[in-house]
Amino acid sequence: MATVHYSRRPGTPPVTLTSSPGMDDVATPIPYLPTYAEAVADAPPPYRSRESLVFSPPLFPHVENGTTQQSYDCLDCAYDGIHRLQLAFLRIRKCCVPAFLILFGILTLTAVVVAIVAVFPEEPPNSTTRNYCPEGEGIYSRLQLVARVCTTKAIYVTKANVAIWSTTPSTLHNLSICIFSCADAFLRDRGLGTSTSGIRTAGGLARTTSGDALFCISSVC
């Protein structure tokens, strides 16, 4: 009958175990292996701390069998690996989950803001014709409105009419805006240029006006 002496860590009294009667012919006695819960409960403080990744010496440094000393590094590695996985999971749950929730909230809020801006644009839709010349409104404010609406479009200005044409070749939308004779001076003062021969859009449309000067505000579009 074989007797096995082993210590869970240096400095603790060895534990003596005796194998069962049918184990006399076993060359290497099988030591008692505690469960993981027992090992962690009996381990030094670094093992019991679930927030630390610093580990003490192996739980099973050696097993004595007479004059033979055998190493159980593989078992030590297995226990350390399990413990490291548990600590890693706890750290992920403690740190990464709140960070993920915060990031998800920021992305959701950004998506909501973008959706609101897309549904309620500042400029009026190009698919409808609308009169921007109510009675009593000055010419300066009307031209300011033209400059705000003309994003990514070419604008043609005559002394009597302003038309906004989309630069998309497939669709040309016209917003009729009445402009009086001071449009000429307004555009010249701001260096936006004049033309009397017509201006060609990206869609291939040429527009000429006989008897009236034609002005383009494409520089602000």
Swiss-Prot record:
| Alphabetized UniProt keyword annotations | Host Golgi apparatus, Host membrane, Membrane, Transmembrane, Transmembrane helix
User: Could you name the Gene Ontology cellular component terms for this entry?
Assistant: host cell Golgi membrane; membrane
> TM segments?
100-120
Q: Where is this region: Disordered?
A: 1-22
Motif PPXY motif in this chain:
44-47
Query: Where is it localised?
Result: Host Golgi apparatus membrane
- Tell me what topology the record assigns in the membrane: Single-pass membrane protein
Domain comment from the record reads as follows: Late-budding domains (L domains) are short sequence motifs essential for viral particle budding. They recruit proteins of the host ESCRT machinery (Endosomal Sorting Complex Required for Transport) or ESCRT-associated proteins. Contains one L domain: a PPXY motif which is involved in the interaction with ITCH, a member of the NEDD4 family.
Report further notes: The vaccine strains V-Oka, VariVax, and VarilRix harbor a mutation in the stop codon that extends the ORF by 92 aminoacids.
Q: How does it assemble?
A: Interacts with host ITCH; this interaction probably mediates ITCH degradation.
Query: What family does this chain come from, according to its entry?
Result: Belongs to the varicellovirus ORF0 protein family.
Q: What protein name applies here?
A: Membrane protein 0
